[in-house]
Amino acid sequence: ETLMDTRTATAELGWTANPPSGWEEVSGYDENLNTIRTYQVCNVFEPNQNNWLLTTFINRRGAHRIYTEMRFTVRDCSSLPNVPGSCKETFNLYYYETDSVIATKKSAFWTEAPYLKVDTIAADESFSQVDFGGRLMKGXXXXXXXXXXXXXXXXXXXXXXXXXXXXXXXXXFFKKCPSVVQNFAIFPETMTGAESTSLVTARGTCIPNAEEVDVPIKLYCNGDGEWMVPIGRCTCKAGYEPENNVACRACPAGTFKASQGAGLCARCPPNSRSSAEASPLCACRNGYFRADLDPPTAACTSVPSGPRNVISIVNETSIILEWNPPRETGGRDDVTYNIVCKKCRADRRACSRCDDNVEFVPRQLGLTETRVFISSLWAHTPYTFEIQAVNGVSNKSPFPPQHVSVNITTNQAAPSTVPIMHQVSATMRSITLSWPQPEQPNGIILDYELRYYEKLSRICTPDVSGTVGSRPAADHNEYNSSVARSQTNTARLEGLRPGMVYVVQVRARTVAGYGKYSGKMCFQTLTDDDYKSELREQLPLIAGSAAAGVVFIVSLVAISIVCSRKRAYSKEVVYSDKLQHYSTGRGSPGMKIYIDPFTYEDPNEAVREFAKEIDVSFVKIEEVIGAGEFGEVYKGRLKLPGKREIYVAIKTLKAGYSEKQRRDFLSEASIMGQFDHPNIIRLEGVVTKSRPVMIITEFMENGALDSFLRQNDGQFTVIQLVGMLRGIAAGMKYLAEMNYVHRDLAARNILVNSNLVCKVSDFGLSRYLQDDTSDPTYTSSLGGKIPVRWTAPEAIAYRKFTSASDVWSYGIVMWEVMSFGERPYWDMSNQDVINAIEQDYRLPPPMDCPAALHQLMLDCWQKDRNTRPRLAEIVNTLDKMIRNPASLKTVATITAVPSQPLLDRSIPDFTAFTSVEDWLSAVKMSQYRDNFLSAGFTSLQLVAQMTSEDLLRIGVTLAGHQKKILNSIQSMRVQMSQSPTSMA
């Protein structure tokens, strides 16, 4: 950059000459005939010449190195005549650094001392007189460089000693590297260094919309004002592309650039868009998504449609599901499948997630195949399976995965394995064993089969001592096994040899057959020495017991005499009522006898003795499922330490209760806690140390038997219904053996679990303690509440409740089961029911009821309670029916029992009906009213012509309902043919 150039001057230069007669400023012309200002001197003929010429003040403007360029002419000394020997053809160039003006016309210093010599200037060519005469300046050019340190300016001085010279032009300038954009970084103009070899570092900054890649960003400026050695660089950031390598331009709408770099903007991938400039990413359109691992350059994809064409193959309690892939994969190739399993109630109105026991092969989630095998399901249970199709973007969608559902109901299956056996006692010749019910009975357990044999070696396994062992090695005696059967979960193996080890296995049987045998367990009979030792240990106890027995008998005789005398004067009904709860019948030897909690002076003591206290923190209440006498009933979960979580039913005592109500509420737990039978509802425990007070029992998925049967009218076979009745009878037999009288046996008080196992429940006494006139089921009688339709006549008339009166109630339950939950005695009043029974009328057989079952009902309804069958006999009779299903094929009719008058409700009087609605109501099929009317069957004449195909067409699909309606239509036709004009 030029600091001074005399060629551009249009006025006097104003330099300082010394002496004044030395250098003279004159005008001249350059080679191009341009006017220029020059200085000349030629005092060669005068001695001692020392002519100085000093430039004006030159501002260096930060330059570290200043260059001077001079154009001049020098006279050839030889062309001058008589020139003295001091004539020279050179002159000297000096410079001086200063911060201010150092010379004027009046003052200056003219010695070499303060100046720094740049060079002695000599011309390449000197000129003669002729050349110089035309004032056309031709001459030589000389360039010199001077380094400037810290001063702000410099002055140049030319000293001519006895020379004839003219300074045609003088220029001072410096070099710099210009501002430049390189590698998308801008570098400022930079002065060269003080030395010609200097490299000056210049820091760069990224241009707008560019970002550093390598740091630091710098260039080097060399002494010639040239950039060199680039280090570091910038590139255009995401959303911008390079333009001519000097700028970063925003990506237009509809394009994007995902990352920093030299790449160009690209069009948005399919199913995406960018509505603004400089987009680093194209947003997916509605309904389309990117997976977390999808690059921005990938197309947006959607979720798959649901699987298609599901095929289900049910095999007892397992199922195979197969399906076709979805029609739409969403544009992806990572489709997998999830299986959602839901276990439902019989009416499918409520479903819940399957428990963790259900097994899926190969897996439940993330299936890549279109097939899954599902096992360990419950028998006779409706299930809904959802097959979800998912892909890499399904988790991005706000909607649940597309799926296809399939409803299935599992079949009857054999029971699961009995988990373990325990030895109750042993003698020299026998072993008494017990075992829990299989975890999955898959129906009603009919009986158990035990297989046992004598082990040749007395050693079972090294880690087993005493009575219980695990699987022993194979034994040749195994092929000579003996078999025993038991109708309960206890058995006594007799006829054994003393001191021998026996290997025992057990399996359960339902109507579906036998389950698998349990693992082999080892048990040992007593040796003669063992028996004698045990006898010696028990002898003092036996003697003491005998003595106590004598005292007890004497006391009992004395008490009996006193009580018999008092009985003549006492008519206390309540006491005798309580007494019958535990003093009826005779218990078997060694059988535990029921103890009435109301005989305790402190009823809370009975609760503590018979019911386990549960910490409320182990209980989780989920939803209300009903209401009881004392409060609401909930479904919940119970997780006891060391045990798996189970569903439970939770009865609560409402707030504001009295102490009497609390005692009455907990009395049911005191009763239930004494029972342990697979057909009796199981008490888990009570919560009495916090509020609300709770009774916790096992949860029965299908609820009360009467409503369950009504919901599944016609859906069960006769053998299944008999299996249910057998379970109820087994539970009642157990209660009778405990000397407990239920008093309120009815289908509404039988609960059904998911395996169709029926369990007797409702042991509360609230109905005797509260007079709720809103419930017509119970009628006041002698100060108590009695369910008339289910109660034996002697109990209604005299409050004589015994196990025999429970047998009468059991006969009514049989009728309820075989009629699929119909109300006993239909819409007759309680008084009409009492009158009919007194006149020896009995209920007729339900539709399609086997004659053998109806006969058993009639046996239960014998007026003389002593002639009714015992509950043990009923269990045996039902077992025979189950073993011989052919005995159930004969269907009972009203005319088949001429000796017993029956209430006749099987053929209603159709002449009394005025509409189809009345007729449907009479046959308990009102739910099909709209089906009949919308299909055009608006009169009884049209209904009488209907066929089974017509019923299917209008939506009557249940086989039991079809049969009931067709039987009624057949009877209607008979009455119409007998009285053709009697019906409108």
Curated annotation (Swiss-Prot):
Q: Which residues lie on this side of the membrane: Cytoplasmic?
A: 563-984
Kindly give the Gene3D superfamilies that the UniProt entry links to this protein.
ephrin a2 ectodomain (2.60.40.1770), Galactose-binding domain-like (2.60.120.260), Immunoglobulins (2.60.40.10), Phosphorylase Kinase, domain 1 (3.30.200.20), Transcription Factor, Ets-1 (1.10.150.50), Transferase(Phosphotransferase) domain 1 (1.10.510.10), Tumor Necrosis Factor Receptor, subunit A, domain 2 (2.10.50.10)
List, for all copies, the residue spans of the domain called SAM. Answer: 911-975
The chain's Extracellular topological domains, given as residue ranges, are 1-541
Asked if the record carries the keyword Oxidoreductase, the reply is no
Query: Which branch of life, at top level?
Result: Eukaryota
Q: Which PROSITE patterns match?
A: EGF_2, EPH_LBD, FN3, PROTEIN_KINASE_ATP, PROTEIN_KINASE_DOM, PROTEIN_KINASE_TYR, RECEPTOR_TYR_KIN_V_2, SAM_DOMAIN
| Enzyme Commission number(s) of this protein | 2.7.10.1
Q: Which GO terms describe its biological process?
A: axon guidance; cell chemotaxis; cell surface receptor protein tyrosine kinase signaling pathway; cell-substrate adhesion; dendritic spine development; dendritic spine morphogenesis; ephrin receptor signaling pathway; establishment of cell polarity
Task: Give every Protein kinase domain span.
Answer: 619-882
Q: Classify the main location.
A: membrane
The UniProt record lists the Fibronectin type-III domain at 303-413, 414-528
Motif PDZ-binding, per the record, lies over: 982-984
Does the keyword Transmembrane helix belong to this entry? yes
Q: Which one of the record's GO molecular function terms can you name?
A: transmembrane receptor protein tyrosine kinase activity
- According to the record, the segments passing through the membrane are 542-562
* Intracellular or extracellular location(s): Cell membrane; Early endosome membrane; Cell projection, Dendrite
**What residues sit in the active site?**
D744
Described purpose of this protein according to its UniProt entry = Receptor tyrosine kinase which binds promiscuously transmembrane ephrin-B family ligands residing on adjacent cells, leading to contact-dependent bidirectional signaling into neighboring cells. The signaling pathway downstream of the receptor is referred to as forward signaling while the signaling pathway downstream of the ephrin ligand is referred to as reverse signaling. May play a role in axon guidance during nervous system development. May also play an important redundant role with other ephrin-B receptors in development and maturation of dendritic spines and synapse formation.
Q: What is this protein called?
A: Ephrin type-B receptor 1
